[in-house]
């Protein structure tokens, strides 16, 4: 874990998490290449199942292509206007060829996207994860091969808004200890008994290293 001791603090990391916002209004200024490269580098270093790194990142800066993608960045009748307005889109695709590992694909891509969001915030850039899209249509626009799947995209640019901090549930509402229902350590809810399904594969015996 060497290489960053003394350069960041736990409090600083937590402050970054708390300060990040989903930005949906952007200035027209282009994103400098050196900042874009750092965002992509953050995604490259995300963990993945067996360190397979199944991702490809498509950087879309061309205005016409961005507009074409934006036409299919919609969920039912909701169209995400900020997709057309952001100066940069990063479309995250995943390799689906391996039948076993494809079950982890969305988790892996989500981790890469999350690291990009945080790096963007650290650089003073605004970003927003967009998951409600027509993946097939966007894949066709961007010539994504059939062996790959569009999982989601990020909008990226300099923010033209400062959203208020979003509400968050307190830990007391979302944390359980040992089993669901124990709100305090040492609660009286006992572990359950498995009554459905078959035991999972013991992956350790298969010498599969899950997270790289």
Region spans (language model):
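Acidic, surface-exposed loops and disordered segments
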Residues: 1-212
